[in-house]
Amino acid sequence: MLERLSWKRLVLELLLCCLPAFILGAFFGYLPWFLLASVTGLLIWHLWNLLRLSWWLWVDRSMTPPPGRGSWEPLLYGLHQMQLRNKKRRRELGNLIKRFRSGAESLPDAVVLTTEEGSIFWCNGLAQQILGLRWPEDNGQNILNLLRYPEFTQYLKTRDFSRPLNLVLNTVRHLEIRVMPYTHKQLLMVARDVTQMHQLEGARRNFFANVSHELRMPLTVLQGYLEMMDEQPLEGAVREKALHTMREQTQRMEGLVKQLLTLSKIEAAPTQLLNEKVDVPMMLRVVEREAQTLSQKKQTFTFEIDNALKVSGNEDQLRSAISNLVYNAVNHTPEGTHITVRWQRVPHGAEFSVEDNGPGIAPEHIPRLTERFYRVDKARSRQTGGSGLGLAIVKHAVNHHESRLNIESTVGKGTRFSFVIPERLIAKNSN
């Protein structure tokens, strides 16, 4: 086993080199000349090894150093071992960087590494999507030149990173940006897309505002009549009118609460529990009778039902979806409208549809029809007792059955609501 170079080895090498000079000098004389020749030969040998080492270090790409003898052998062997260790460390460091980048790419947030001045030296893929960065084209670019927002510039310049920055991109996307010091004079920037959270917060505010608004009017009516009764007793027709109005408003509030509870129940229901066998044809026969009663012969109906077509699902949710679509057609179409209800087999499953030849719905309203409390004609909806929750209930109910609500409408020609229950949920004995 080779050991490191020592003084003993160097002195021994020098003595061995000079030994022939001593022997020859003892026999022939001229000892100084023989010693000079020996030392010169040793020097030339060292210079030759130095040139070989320099060639290997600067020119030769081989990992193995040139073979060495004497004092050069442990030196060259040590250099070779050091190179192997460095290669191993570089490989380990490369693997560590790969794991770090792989982990950073898996993060659900955009990650950017910059210098203290803002020069980018790395970013993950999500940063390219969310912040619009390009890698490696933007390497070395100042992030303030790429994200030109005054509040972002001020946030970086003040150096107060105790709170995140909420930034709005292009009036649509909301970002939450956090900046943390990262090693010496470097910054770690994490950007999270919180657009959906802002939308949910807005929906929550609108929901409570709408519920408050819907309850305020019937409560105001009830309060008004109660105050009238306190001031003077009501008799005859006035009393009957007051009781009738209070009863209507109470029923309206009760209906609103029931629909809110139904919507909450559907949203909270587990989607995987679709194991009930639902007799949709029988359900539609009940809905047909109720629709005829609700219509009071103002509309005409055609029910085209495949009596053998049954599905697996949640019966309460499907009943809510089907009845809401049919009752909406009755409540929101004028007298003389013809309503066609179909339950039939289609190539990809079982389709339920409600079609009418009424006035239709303007295109700008269609994307918002399934929002809670959204109404196309608010005055007419309140007159018919509509709460604006029916289509929201339908949307969530059909989503739980791996489907989606389709709405097609042409102004002046009519509207068609439909959804398709997928093939896998059709009962096996359905033809």
Swiss-Prot record:
Cytoplasmic face of the membrane: 1-13, 60-431
Listed transmembrane segments: 14-34, 39-59
GO molecular function: ATP binding; phosphoprotein phosphatase activity; phosphorelay sensor kinase activity
Chain positions with Phosphohistidine modification: 213
Physiological role: Member of the two-component regulatory system PhoR/PhoB involved in the phosphate regulon genes expression. PhoR may function as a membrane-associated protein kinase that phosphorylates PhoB in response to environmental signals.
Domain Histidine kinase, first and last residues per copy: 210-425
Keyword Transmembrane: yes
GO cellular component: plasma membrane
InterPro entries per UniProt: 2-comp_sensor_kinase, HATPase_C_sf, His_kinase_dom, HisK_dim/P_dom, HisK_dim/P_sf, PAS, PAS-like_dom_sf, PAS_fold
Alphabetic keyword roster: ATP-binding, Cell inner membrane, Cell membrane, Kinase, Membrane, Nucleotide-binding, Phosphate transport, Phosphoprotein, Transferase, Transmembrane, Transmembrane helix, Transport, Two-component regulatory system
Main subcellular location: membrane
Annotated PAS domain residues: 96-167
A Pfam family annotated for this UniProt entry: PAS
EC number from the UniProt entry: 2.7.13.3
Entry's Gene Ontology BP terms: cellular response to phosphate starvation; phosphate ion transport; regulation of DNA-templated transcription
Organism listed in the record: Shigella dysenteriae
Reactions performed catalytically: ATP + protein L-histidine = ADP + protein N-phospho-L-histidine
Periplasmic side: 35-38
Compartmental location: Cell inner membrane
Name of protein: Phosphate regulon sensor protein PhoR
First-level EC class: transferase
Heme recorded as keyword: no
Name of the coding gene: phoR
Paired cysteines (S-S): none
